[in-house]
Amino acid sequence: MWIRSRETMKKVLQKYWAWAFVVIPLLLQAIFFYVPMFQGAFYSFTNWTGLTYNYKFVGLNNFKLLFMDPKFMNAIGFTAIITIAMVVGEIALGIFIARVLNSKIKGQTFFRSWFFFPAVLSGLTVALIFKQVFNYGLPAIGNALHIEFLQTSLLGTKWGAIFAAVFVLLWQGVAMPIIIFLAGLQSIPTEITEAARIDGATSKQVFWNIELPYLLPSVSIVFILALKGGLTAFDQVFAMTGGGPNNATTSLGLLVYNYAFKNNQFGYANAIAVILFFLIVVISIIQLRVSKKFEI
């Protein structure tokens, strides 16, 4: 009897044990992701300050105020600049460097590790390092070599700070796309490229007609990652420029932080976050549908 009950218990455990590994992560995701997400969406229709449990339902008033807020429009402009730069830069540079690393060059393993190195650093660390470079390193070089535009910190001017922010985000952001594109290139059957070269295809023709179509799924992944990275840029910008000078480098993510934690306008900040969420979703869906038409 005892043996039979033990066997029954063993069968029950075998049957439901796997479900535990599915249910527990889903439960944790619901608690720490979906619940806060829906709470944030709800609070975007209120004037909640984040300091008390008291709030008043204001409907769409937060969203109406957003489009009359010069800080929001300025943040939209800067975020658009860094997002476009990251999407174009990560795809173009990622494919170019991945093709170089995929070719037969000496020290291939070293260069792969070298280009991936920025991905393992925290954004805050990278930003603080480059802040010192832009504030002290480049001006010292500019003074030594009598290069006028380098004699003052890039972070002190509007377009200099924007350039610095884009450069740092792209320097760190391109590391992962290189690995993704490299994996995509190595998945292309060598028989196809060899046959094309035997038939007289140039390197440019091989890229446009064979490699690029095979890389489109990788392009879709990198596009979404770069889009998300650009639209939600925060830590590098916060640590390096703080949104300055004169709010020139205030991203949407930084604006959410400022309104929520500096001005105690959590309802208003959540309204910005909701718009940001829908921007990412809509653009990602459009991109995925367009790219599927060209995939092999």
Identify the residue ranges that each predicted region occupies.
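A structural signal for multi-pass alpha-helical bundles of membrane permease subunits
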Residues: 10-296
